[in-house]
Amino acid sequence: MAAGQDRAMPHPVLIIAHRGASGERPEHTMLSYQRAIDQGADYIEPDLVPTKDGVLVARHENNIADTTDVATHPEFAARKATKTIDGETMTGWFTEDFTLAELKTLRAKERLPQLRPGNAAFDGQADIPTFDEIIALAKRASAANGRMIGIYPETKHPSYFASIGLPTDARLVAALKAAGWDRADAPVFIQSFEVDNLKRLKAMTSVRLIQLMAATGAPADHAASSYAAMATPAGLRAVAAYAYGIGPDKAMILPAIPGAKPTALIADAHAAGLKVHPWTFRAENIFLSPDYRVPGTPATHGRIEDEIRAFIGYGVDGFFTDYPYKGASARASALAAAAERGKD
């Protein structure tokens, strides 16, 4: 097997379902993950945060004010708090202040109802899933569909959670080991915007690691001066010492200005031996690169498939999308076109 080849997956470009099929169902719910699997996703992505009793659950943030009905539960009114996490002060209800049993009494809701009103029709239909439940879903679906469906967990705010006595790295590794997924060829990637926890994880597991990068700012653990510095050829060589690939904001590859040309990031990452999985491809105008927007409102769906095809043409190895079926369609047409060109 060639170095770096993904034995578990049949395609050269991976479709990573961002929080599940979050363009069509409330994010980080079994509804969303199942929808993504049905639409052809290769991987489903749970962002992981801990409960008070140390159970890993899937929420984009530990503040669950916008993604659950917690505000309607009078028994939890006193849990409302203001906290500073990674330099950002926020008010709401936080997973680390609830036991798993308490969280399971809540119901998920759509985070962006103004942009995705159709998703709000599913409010109240799903609870907060645990990481173990998501692993079990991926295994059941793999057996039922006759194809491997992987998981792509993100460790959220690892330094913050360690600082309050709820470190997540060992819990994540233990769950993967229990699932039999502790090999470099397991259908798993672990991702983080921080650096030091990925370095720790490298010593704890053989699972492939992905260094996430934002278009601005720096890792919250202050392990690097900026994401921009990490994205230079020298920075990428340093990342390659502990990571299998990078997950950059797609604006780091195609700047978010009309008429932009792609940067050298993909070529530089590949030269360092890193795979490239950019985020996040969403259909709504507000999220698309400027050249792929269409007339209408911020919620109007633009030319997402054209955008994905362009990035596949640039050489990405996978991509995160809220709309896996559109990603699957774009990938199929891009690969068919490439195969046709190869006949010439």
What are these regions (language model features)?
Residues 1-344:
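Phosphate-group recognition and catalysis centered on beta-loop-alpha active-site segments
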